[in-house]
């Protein structure tokens, strides 16, 4: 109710007003001046379009939002350079043609980009005493299954991952969410369970996977856990799992998950008694605890959650506010600790992703 009253409804009203004035401005460029009843009719039409986009939450919704943001930015550009080519610019902007063209191109790119899954490779060198051939780890996160990808597309991606012959695969949270049906959840983990790797597939919970009071999940946390485990996937939740004697996986509970029966352990508590001579691979859905993990001896931190911003201009806002320790990619947090954040295999909410690639990550860890 808070979301509806405080955010959604006021936002929809503002967008409706903007779309109304956008339409009337475009008509004026073609010499059409509306009478009062015509203006009201235009406003009603804008309200219907915004309402449909709000309820449907599809590509049209994203196109509409891009239209509004781009139009405002182009208006600002026109004000800054109004003395040069003002007449031509006024027609391009006033008619809405340039705005509509740019919005359409950006959204179409985002749609195609969403379904073009890439492999992103990183190489990390460590001074820890690990085997000469090193380790290869696949990182997958933020599938939000059911929003975009379907069974055959996910299977194709998993077949590509299997072909990499890696040592382990980490599913780093938000593989499913509140919009995933129970049938989709079951199919999703059946497909992920088919991945072939030397030491197996490991699961780290995210903030969307499990249901909370008031959520709309069609499966319980118990059903989710049962399906993950029954498909041969190992859940690593607030524990240290030895992959080999020299290579340890530290799986952290999702930060802030209130459905967990106990407060999550601190990074220091997790690695208490663990040899710092071993390579410590921390896996945590949200990249928000770099300092804590680094202090506990993390050599590498793998995360998801951010989607790389997913859509312009949201990615710019996320970069400016810096609510995460790392928005996307690889960064050296300290001389001893590296953090890698994936933009995710798919997306959340809408099947449009124009700020970052759809990807799975392959990390090669080698001795110096």
Task: Give each language-model segment a name.
Residues 1-115:
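Non-catalytic terminal accessory segments
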Residues 2-3, 35, 56, 83-94, ...:
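Serine/threonine-rich low-complexity intrinsically disordered regions
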Residues 6, 39, 83-87, 128, ...:
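Context-gated lysine
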Residues 82-140, 146-164:
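N-terminal signal-anchor transmembrane helix
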Residues 130-368:
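Soluble catalytic domains of enzymes that build or remodel membrane lipids, polysaccharides, and related
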């Amino acid at each position: 109710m808070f979301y509806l009253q405080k955010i959604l409804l006021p936002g929809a009203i503002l967008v409706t007003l903007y779309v109304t004035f956008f339409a009337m401005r475009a008509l004026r460029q073609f010499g059409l001046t509306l009478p009062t009843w015509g203006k009201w009719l235009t406003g009603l039409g804008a309200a219907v379009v915004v309402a449909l986009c709000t309820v449907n939450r599809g590509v049209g919704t994203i196109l509409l939002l891009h239209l509004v943001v781009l139009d405002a930015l182009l208006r600002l550009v026109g004000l800054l350079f109004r003395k040069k080519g003002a007449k031509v610019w006024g027609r391009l902007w006033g008619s809405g043609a340039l705005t509509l063209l740019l919005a359409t191109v950006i959204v179409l790119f985002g749609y195609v980009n969403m379904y073009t899954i890439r492999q992103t490779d990183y190489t990390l060198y460590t001074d820890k005493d690990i085997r000469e051939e090193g380790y290869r780890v696949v990182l997958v996160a933020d599938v939000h299954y059911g929003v975009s990808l379907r069974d055959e597309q996910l299977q194709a991606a998993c077949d590509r991952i299997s072909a990499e012959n890696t040592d382990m695969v980490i599913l780093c949270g938000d593989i499913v969410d509140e919009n995933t049906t129970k049938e989709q959840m079951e199919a999703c983990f059946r497909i992920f369970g088919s991945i072939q790797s030397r030491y197996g597939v490991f699961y780290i919970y995210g903030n969307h996977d499990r249901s909370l009071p008031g959520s709309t999940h069609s499966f319980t946390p118990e059903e989710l856990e049962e399906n993950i485990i029954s498909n041969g996937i190992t859940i690593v939740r607030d524990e240290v799992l030895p992959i080999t004697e020299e290579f340890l996986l530290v799986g952290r509970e999702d930060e802030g998950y209130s459905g967990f029966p106990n407060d999550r352990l601190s990074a220091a508590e997790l690695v208490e008694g663990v040899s710092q001579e071993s390579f410590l691979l921390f896996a945590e859905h949200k990249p928000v605890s770099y300092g804590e993990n680094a202090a506990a001896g993390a050599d590498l931190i793998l995360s998801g959650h951010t989607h790389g911003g997913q859509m312009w201009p949201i990615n710019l806002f996320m970069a400016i506010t810096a609510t995460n320790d790392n928005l996307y990619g690889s960064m050296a947090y300290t001389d001893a600790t590296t953090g890698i954040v994936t933009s995710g295999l798919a997306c959340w909410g809408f099947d449009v992703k124009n700020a970052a690639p759809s990807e799975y990550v392959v990390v090669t860890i080698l001795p110096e």
